[in-house]
Structure formats: C-alpha cells, structure tokens
A protein has these predicted regions:
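A short beta-strand-turn-helix
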Residues: 38-59
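Acidic helix N-cap motif at the loop->helix transition within catalytic regions
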Residues: 104-107
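Conserved helix-turn-beta segment immediately C-terminal to the redox Cys motif
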Residues: 57-58, 73-97, 111
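Short pre-active-site segment immediately N-terminal to redox-active cysteine/selenocysteine motifs
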Residues: 57-59, 64-67
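Positively charged n-region of N-terminal signal peptides that target proteins for export
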Residues: 1-6
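N-proximal helix/coil linker or "cap" segments that precede and/or mark the start of modular domains
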Residues: 18-38
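Short, internal strand/loop/helix patches
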Residues: 110-125
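Bacterial N-terminal signal peptides
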Residues: 8-17
Length: 125
C-alpha cells in the first residue's frame, strides 16, 4: 500500500512537470541584454506611450502588482530616490506598469500611495 502511494505521488508530480513544460504561451522569450520589445501603453490618465516616444532614451521598466509586497518596497524607493533625480531628464523615461490592472484600479491604488510618477495599466498582461 505504501509503495502504491509513493508511485501515485511520483506519477502526479511527473504529470505536472510534463504539463508545465508543454505549455507554450506563444510569446517570444526575452533574455538579459536583448533589445526591448516594441510596446505601446495606453492610459486614460497619462496618455499613450509608443516605441517612438522611447527612442534614444534610457528606459527603466518596472512591472508591478498592487498586491505584491516586494513591488511596494521597490516603488517606494523609486519615489524617494530615483524619481526626484531623473523626472526632469528628457533622456530618461520611467515606465511603471501595473500587470493585470486597469486605469481605475491604478488610480485608486495611487490615491493611497501618492506616487508622483505615472502608472500605466496592462490589464491583459
């Protein structure tokens, strides 16, 4: 009986590994050092950001979620140290992107956090 449980557990784990490795999101994988993919961000609050807006600029991209603890620490640090130093630099662009969040959700979130940098939605991730 004990051997049957062990084999059953191993089979379940193996099936999970196979299922996870078989998933293909159809999205191109990005590696460190690759060029940034051409993205367009649309915000009812902050407007549209296109690849042309980013050309020739240093771009810092921060992907976050409102429920993510480490993200909250990172964004607070960006607000405190990085944003005041670079916000007026025409060659710098900060893209803080709320994954799976809408403009309305980000607006409500920012009413609490009081960040002075733009938050762009990515509701469809």
């Amino acid at each position: 009986m004990k051997n049957l449980r062990i084999w059953s557990l191993l089979c379940l784990i193996w099936m999970g590994v196979l299922a996870a490795s078989a998933q293909d999101t159809g999205k191109e994988k990005i590696s460190l050092g690759d060029a940034m993919p051409a993205i367009t961000l649309n915000s009812e609050i902050y407007g549209k950001v296109t690849p042309a807006d980013l050309k020739g600029k240093v771009v810092l991209v921060s992907l976050f979620a409102t429920w993510c603890g480490p993200c909250q620490i990172e964004l607070a640090e960006v607000q405190k140290t990085l944003w005041p130093k670079y916000k007026d630099n025409k060659d710098f662009k900060l893209l803080v992107i709320g994954r799976e969040h809408t403009d309305a959700e980000l607006k409500k979130y920012n009413e609490r956090k009081k960040f002075s940098f733009p938050l762009y939605p990515d509701p469809k991730r």
